[in-house]
């Protein structure tokens, strides 16, 4: 005997309990709330800011660990805190570091996006993630989660594009993206008279 199919779900927009067969949510009016493209795990990330920030931090941490594991012999284990647990340049280049050299010599324009998720040391990763966790909730509160992610991504691309135009040979990190979030928060405060 088969188990009965669950016919209730949370509306992807307002998060109230509704029937999966509803043509539209009776609370918020969202059309076809039971459709698979509106109610899946990937899109669910964009409804919970804490879950999204945890996922974004997890991607940064996972790529950092992967960059360390790609070449364990090139690992920086010195006593200098700025270089402790630092991956080598070849690992970072393989994963998508950007700059004049990767873009001009290897034609990796996609690295303008990927470099925001790579970090040069444990301290670099730690400071970027702490700043992200402090600033992103404010930006999410004022602009919304999707706009915060757009500002973060486009800020990273813009920062790395400026680095490329300035001739920086090799660059990584989420600092440009985090600074874009700071700029968005400052703009919001200034435009509201703060």
Predicted regions and their residues:
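A detector for small-residue-rich transmembrane helices and their helix-helix packing motifs
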Residues: 6-20, 26-194
